[in-house]
């Protein structure tokens, strides 16, 4: 995966910026996900994913890639699916599969 991402970054048709300012708001990581997937900014109050993620249709990357390129998409997150309303928002964004904390095996020993 990294060689592919590197090729996108170094392509002459790619715009890349080295001086970027943090735009997340009250939604924290959910705002970052919203911006990456949809291009929309976070809300001043609350989380976009919580307030609008399950009720509105957004033109998100997974949906666009599925519709225009036939891609199947999956998303992985180590927290519960209901946290920041991810279980609903990810479906609205067009993800085919969502693997949350219940999918992963938890280990007490991290060594």
Where are these regions (language model features)?
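Active-site-proximal alpha/beta segments of enzymes that process anionic O-linked groups
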Residues: 2-111
